[in-house]
Regions:
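Catalytic domains of carbohydrate-active enzymes, especially glycoside hydrolases
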Residues: 1-7, 35, 39-40
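Structural detector of well-ordered beta-strand residues that form the stable sheet scaffold
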Residues: 7, 82-83, 187, 239
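Early extracytoplasmic/lumenal segment of secretory-pathway proteins
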Residues: 10
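A short, local hydrophobic-aromatic micro-motif
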Residues: 39, 116, 189, 236-239, ...
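Extracellular/luminal regions of secreted and cell-surface proteins that mediate adhesion/ECM remodeling
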Residues: 273-405
Length: 405
């Protein structure tokens, strides 16, 4: 149905000290990639969880599997978006697991791990090694590849700890920024209440947690940590657990008769009250070639504008016209190329359009990008549709040595 997005998950399995397998694979995976152009692909599901029902792979194995799948998918569909992580919860212990993944990737492949986004779960679970304390190792255990007796210890009553939930979201965004991934989206692909009703988590308590977290995720932003393409919001998309799984809690529909539960009705009532908004703006301007060197002959430069939508519409809004100018169009700036168009859903989605700028000469140039110049689309912020970017066409190039470790 309209507005529903399905995200594919490729499950991982460690087969030896360095070996791995994944599912789907072979022709089944290739066909899925071809039949779903531009799809998001989650690589692994809770790879940091020691259990037979989750992926349970050591960090170096995750890095190797991710590398293989990233390039396999991108070679088949360059528009695909590859999402890393999907850890159980962003605690310090599990961020250490991800740091080990990144370190292994760099050691093995000589570069930073490429991602199109990060995914996390955010359940509030105990972290105790079953080898250390078998009587109290319920929850998330200790990630494979890490030998610690415990990490973050919580009680069953903490399963709806809202302050802890928020703290973890901020912690992960800080982790992303510190490792150079701030300009990537964050997806909270699974969270909710796992403790069953007979543990004290009846529907009213679950619904209260749902409402608080939904309100937070809808509005939480940080000018130094958030995703710039989405108004600096911390989380771009999230998914409540679960739709029908009654083995835990939070199910929106009865798995037997398909009827909506009290939690499902709360979900529907809460989300139906959220007004749909659109907010398009120019985000980045890139050039091809990346470095512009003038040697006496005017250059032909490809200007590539990335346009983002920080509204919340699940359905693409458009087409919206995008225009390029050399100089401020309000003061006689000269239009570059023909009109281009974008059709974007919200929550930080980005589209790229380009024009060719001919006759570029040496100097500093102000290139303006204007989105929805004719005001066809109603937006929550009409003041951010125009942005100027500085493009330098230099006359000299300096080559400097680079050392890496």
């Amino acid at each position: 149905p309209a507005g529903v997005e399905f995200v594919s998950v490729i499950r991982l399995s460690q087969t030896s000290e360095t070996g791995f397998s994944y599912s789907p694979s072979g022709a089944a995976l290739t066909n899925a990639i071809v039949n779903n152009p531009g799809a998001r692909w989650l690589i692994g599901n809770e790879p940091d969880r020691r259990t037979s029902i989750q992926d349970n792979v050591e960090p170096h194995v995750y890095a190797a599997a991710y590398h293989e799948l990233y390039y396999l998918i991108k070679q088949t569909d360059p528009t695909a978006r590859i999402i890393a992580g999907t850890i159980v919860q962003p605690t310090p212990l599990r961020l250490r697991y991800l740091d080990m993944v990144l370190s292994s990737y760099r050691q093995s492949f000589g570069t930073t791990m490429p991602v199109d986004g990060w995914s996390i779960h955010n359940f509030i679970l105990n972290e105790v090694s079953c080898a250390h304390d078998p009587g109290n190792c319920w929850g998330a255990e200790i990630p494979p590849g890490i030998d610690e007796p415990f990490g973050e210890i919580v009680s069953v009553e903490d399963n709806d700890d809202f302050d802890r939930f928020k703290e973890r979201v901020v912690r992960f965004r800080q982790w992303m920024k510190d490792r150079g991934y701030r300009e990537k989206p964050l997806y909270l692909s699974e969270y909710g209440i796992l403790m069953p009703p007979d543990y004290g988590f009846e529907a009213p308590r679950v619904n209260a947690y749902m409402n608080k977290t939904f309100n937070y995720l809808t509005t939480a932003a940080d000018a130094t940590l958030g995703f710039p393409a989405d108004g600096n919001r911390l989380v771009q998309k999230w998914s409540w657990y679960s739709a029908t799984d009654q083995n835990y809690n939070g199910w929106l529909f009865d798995s037997g008769n398909g009827q909506m539960t009290a939690m499902g009705r709360n979900f529907a009532n809460h989300t139906s009250s959220i007004a749909i908004s659109n907010d398009l703006s120019p985000w980045k301007l890139l050039t091809t070639p990346a470095t512009l060197h003038y040697t006496g002959t005017p250059l032909s430069v490809q200007l590539r504008a990335q346009v983002s939508s920080s509204g919340n519409s699940a359905i693409p809004t458009g087409p919206a016209v995008v225009r390029f100018y050399r100089g401020d169009p309000a003061q006689g700036g000269v239009k570059i190329g023909a009109d281009k168009f974008v059709d974007l859903a919200g929550c930080g989605n980005v589209a790229e359009v380009s024009v060719t700028w001919t006759g570029a000469t040496a100097g500093v140039h102000n290139i303006f990008v204007v989105v929805d110049a004719d005001g066809v689309i109603a937006e929550s912020d009409e003041a951010n549709n125009t942005r100027s970017f500085t493009v330098l066409v230099g006359t000299r190039r300096l080559f400097a040595p680079i050392t890496t470790r």
